[in-house]
UniProtKB/Swiss-Prot annotation:
Protein name: Long-chain fatty acid transport protein 6
Gene, per the UniProt record: SLC27A6
Matches recorded under Gene3D superfamilies: 3.30.300.30, N-terminal domain of ligase-like (3.40.50.12780)
Tissue: Strongly expressed in heart and localizes to cardiac myocytes. Expressed at moderate levels in placenta, testis, and adrenal glands. Expressed at very low levels in kidney, bladder and uterus.
One GO CC term on file: sarcolemma
Bilayer topology annotation: Multi-pass membrane protein
Species per Swiss-Prot/TrEMBL record: Homo sapiens (Human)
GO terms classed as biological process: long-chain fatty acid import into cell; long-chain fatty acid metabolic process; long-chain fatty acid transport; very long-chain fatty acid metabolic process
Top-rank taxon, per record: Eukaryota
Alphabetical list of InterPro entries matching this protein: AMP-bd_C (IPR025110), AMP-bd_C_sf (IPR045851), AMP-binding_CS (IPR020845), AMP-dep_synth/lig_dom (IPR000873), ANL_N_sf (IPR042099)
Length: 619
């Protein structure tokens, strides 16, 4: 009898297992992911209830006591243990305690390249309870001044290699801002932080200076990339840092991992997911001053790297390198980041071995995020019923002509169906606050949508168009500002760029729309960089786009460039290209026009340009 029951039970379990695999193939993946999210929420709730947070800095100090000799940062072959970083950052804190009027809550701007002192200064100021504003090291002159003014700092700390950048704006800085340089010899008007560090004590700083009780407390300002306008100082709260620092853990990283960080530390990916993520785990990071495709794998082998951070272009640059022997001879098991194209993803895995690519979606200023924890190629993440309850987001229809969300006759926004691109919006409430930007409230207000589904509700407009498929995987479609309309259809620039990028002589493709008198919408144009030692095959470009793209999405114009403007995280800038248009009198670089009769692209001459502008050639 017992044997019969056990047989029936066993058979039932097998049937249930196969039914689960058939009907709910991602059940256990979803379950474990949601469980991790719930654990993070429970931890944050405990902090709130207790009225005192355990911040990333607190966790770092705990590691410095428990594992003082463990390497925290490896930089250019030098090892900085948790204890080393603790003592050096305490020296920084004592310099400002003894030689400045900085107090808890004051803002200090930090302009420094990737180096250990970036972390020393950041953590040292955090020990004083200061808010640190990370400045983009690529900006200059008035743009730099605007960023400094936007975050309203009491002090500015500058790396040795960037003092020249600041020297030219010193006369324009407010007298209330003290400028500190990480160099013995500094320009007039700058205080040598390096000199004072040599005599500063490394004693612990009293915790009273940096104790935090509110999750909503501001701890950082991180500037947006500026791809859609001037960079804005996003307010980063303790809540956002604690959430972001858990990403490595959520993807399966442990204290035994060695994380390779090549992205700029002024960016949230490297600072919050990378450095803070290592602190969360008690792990080691290998810090690179600047990403180098040629040195990447040799560094990974040299330092036994097991995890690295990427943005999509980084992986593409690695795939563009000449093939070498032993490319799979490394210990890397995880690649964590965002923006990798499907074709690059496949090529990367095929070429560099069994590395799990962990794609995610997040924005500097947003509280919403998605994680691709199943490894589905091309997806930025996945959602399910339980995650939707924890993270309130929606995908709504977007009007590309009016450049705003569509609304029905009652004035409410409209949900998209699965498989359709929709504007990603996130509910703003006490559970998912939006902290906005420093400076004029208009910057914050412009990101909010009101009365979306009912009177009084408020949503954050991410500006990203996302597609949710039938299996609940999410895919990035385009930015609202990048998508343009032509022939009554919406053209996704990322899709067009991906198709052109498949050609073996194309290194880079940046797609945008240009206005033409007499036509509604914008005609597609692609700026292209060729691979070294290759030539442009215009017939192949034509064949590629007409084969893989609908007629309305095929670029009407090509522009050949040697170099493209990009942000510090390799996002291609389009604004100037759009402004330039396709006028051969204004552009010295080669321009080409799509000729359907010749089934090729042809040189865009002054005569052709005039014919297009006069309407003699129809597009």
């Amino acid at each position: 009898m017992l044997l019969s029951w056990l047989t029936v039970l066993g058979a039932g379990m097998v049937v249930l297992h196969f039914l689960q695999k058939l009907l709910f193939p991602y059940f256990w993946d979803d379950f474990w992911f949601v469980l991790k999210v719930v654990l993070i929420i429970i931890r944050l709730k405990k902090y709130e209830k207790r009225g005192e947070l355990v911040t990333v800095l607190d966790k770092f100090l705990s590691h410095a006591k428990r594992q003082p000799r463990k390497p925290f940062i490896i930089y250019e072959g030098d090892i900085y243990t948790y204890q080393d970083v603790d003592k050096r950052s305490s020296r920084v804190a004592h310099v400002f305690l003894n030689h400045s009027s900085l107090k808890k809550g004051d803002t200090v701007a930090l302009l420094m390249s990737n180096e250990p002192d970036f972390v020393h200064v950041w953590f040292g100021l955090a020990k004083l309870g200061c808010v640190v504003a990370f400045l983009n090291t690529n900006i200059r002159s008035n743009s730099l001044l605007n960023c400094i003014r936007a975050c309203g700092p009491r002090a500015l700390v500058v790396g040795a290699d960037l003092l020249g950048t600041v020297e030219e704006i010193l006369p324009s800085l407010s007298e209330n801002i003290s400028v500190w340089g990480m160099k013995d010899s500094v320009p007039q008007g700058v205080i040598s932080l390096k000199e004072k560090l040599s005599t500063s004590p490394d004693e612990p700083v009293p915790r009273s200076h940096h104790v935090v009780s509110l999750l909503k407390s501001t701890c950082l300002y991180i500037f947006t990339s500026g791809t859609t306008g001037l960079p804005k100082a996003a307010v980063i709260s303790q809540l956002q840092v604690l959430r972001g620092s858990a990403v490595l853990w959520a993807f399966g990283c442990t204290a035994h991992d060695i994380v390779y960080i090549t992205l700029p530390l002024y960016h949230s990916s490297a600072a919050i997911l990378g450095i803070s993520g290592c602190v969360e785990l008690g792990a080691t990071c290998v810090l690179k001053k600047k990403f180098s495709a040629s040195q990447f794998w040799s560094d990974c082998k040299k330092y036994d790297v097991t995890v690295f951070q990427y943005i999509g272009e980084l992986c593409r640059y690695l795939c563009k390198q000449s093939k070498r022997e032993g490319e799979k001879d490394h210990k890397v098991r995880l690649a964590i980041g965002n923006g990798i194209r499907s074709d690059v993803w496949r090529e990367f895995l095929d070429r560099f071995g069994n590395i799990k690519v962990c794609e995610l979606y997040a924005a500097t200023e947003s509280s919403i995020s998605f994680m691709n924890y199943t490894g589905r190629i091309g997806a930025i993440g996945r959602t399910n019923l339980f995650y939707k309850l924890l993270s309130t987001f929606d995908l709504i229809k977007y009007d590309f002509q009016k450049d705003e969300p569509m609304r029905n006759e009652q004035g409410w926004c409209i949900h998209v169906k699965k498989g359709e691109p929709g504007l990603l919006i996130s509910r703003v409430n006490a559970k998912n606050p939006f902290f906005g930007y420093a400076g004029p409230y208009k910057h914050t207000k412009d990101k909010l949508l009101c009365d979306v589904f009912k009177k009084g509700d408020v949503y954050l407009n991410t500006g990203d168009l996302i597609v949710q498929d039938q299996d609940n995987f999410l895919y990035f479609w385009d930015r609202t500002g990048d998508t343009f309309r032509w022939k009554g259809e919406n053209v996704a620039t990322t899709e067009v760029a991906d198709v052109i990028g498949m050609l073996d002589f194309i290194q880079e493709a940046n797609v945008y729309g240009v206005a033409i008198s007499g036509y509604e919408g914008r005609a597609g144009m692609a700026s292209i960089i060729l691979k070294p030692n290759t030539s442009l095959d215009l017939e192949k470009v034509y064949e590629q786009v007409v084969t893989f793209l609908p007629a309305y999405a095929c670029p009407r114009f090509l522009r050949i460039q040697e170099k493209m403007e990009a942000t510090g995280t390799f996002k291609l800038l389009k604004h100037q290209l759009v402004e330039d248009g396709f006028n051969p009198l204004k552009i010295s670089e080669p321009l080409y026009f799509m000729d359907n009769l010749k089934k090729s692209y042809v040189l865009l001459t002054r005569e052709l340009y005039d014919q297009i502008m006069l309407g003699e050639i129809k597009l």
